[in-house]
From Swiss-Prot:
Top enzyme class: transferase
Residue sites binding S-adenosyl-L-methionine per the record: G63, F68, I112, E113, R125
Similarity section: Belongs to the methyltransferase superfamily. RNA methyltransferase RsmG family.
Function, in words: Specifically methylates the N7 position of guanine in position 527 of 16S rRNA.
Protein name: Ribosomal RNA small subunit methyltransferase G
EC number of the protein: 2.1.1.170
Molecular function via GO: rRNA (guanine-N7-)-methyltransferase activity
Keywords: Cytoplasm, Methyltransferase, rRNA processing, S-adenosyl-L-methionine, Transferase
Catalytic activity, reaction form: guanosine(527) in 16S rRNA + S-adenosyl-L-methionine = N(7)-methylguanosine(527) in 16S rRNA + S-adenosyl-L-homocysteine
Location(s), subcellular: Cytoplasm
Source superkingdom: Bacteria
InterPro entries tied to this protein: rRNA_ssu_MeTfrase_G, SAM-dependent_MTases_sf
Length: 192
């Protein structure tokens, strides 16, 4: 189990309450995950911290939605987080949620394909297949790696992506779900 300081747990509990409150008016998370919120959403996001060696980085979270994993990682100590979300209603929520963190959070209300930004690490959760992710981020420069929370079809996604892209990857077991995996991707290059 992960050791999480009390101050961070308190902030994550405030974030949890905010998500539940806003979820009544805009669909941030599935209603059937509310009963298991801490494990399904908070811990699922928080587990990425074990693959972030240096917290003094710029992390970009695409398709941020309810702020998983971006807001959680900021609360846990990542110095600068940019959240990219096309839905204005979700961006308004993310703006409110960003106040919980002591760190720098930037909300970008645009389609991912239009965003030009540099970062050390790129994350996403419940967004899309690998090929779609890689195609969407053509204007985003990822210096270090991708940390992608994936489900049971992760191997098929890797095989399909390898037809169009060269990349190195590690597969880590999720601590929250037997079928869940964390793909750590680096050295991404499109095959011409």
């Amino acid at each position: 189990m992960m050791e999480v300081p009390r101050e961070i747990i308190e902030k994550l509990e405030i974030f949890q309450k905010l998500v539940k409150k806003w979820n009544k008016s805009i669909n941030l998370v599935s209603d059937n995950t509310i009963h298991n919120f801490w494990q399904r959403h908070i811990l699922d996001s928080l587990q990425l911290m074990q693959y972030i060696d240096n917290k003094e980085i710029h992390l970009v979270d695409i398709g941020s939605g309810a702020g998983f994993p971006g807001i959680v990682l900021s609360i846990a100590g990542v110095a600068k987080v940019s959240l990219i979300e096309a839905d204005l209603r979700k961006c308004i929520f993310l703006e409110k949620a960003s106040k919980i963190s002591n760190n720098n959070i930037q909300i970008i209300n645009q389609r991912i394909e239009k965003v030009e930004i540099d970062c050390s690490i790129l994350t996403c959760r419940a967004f899309s297949k690998l090929n779609t992710i890689f195609n969407c981020i053509k204007n985003i420069s990822v210096q270090e790696k991708f940390l992608l929370l994936k489900g049971k079809n992760y191997l098929t996604e890797i095989v399909e992506a390898k037809e169009m892209w060269l990349f190195d990857y590690l597969i880590h077991q999720s601590i929250t779900c037997e079928e869940g995996k964390i793909l750590e991707v680096s050295n991404l290059t499109k095959i011409i």
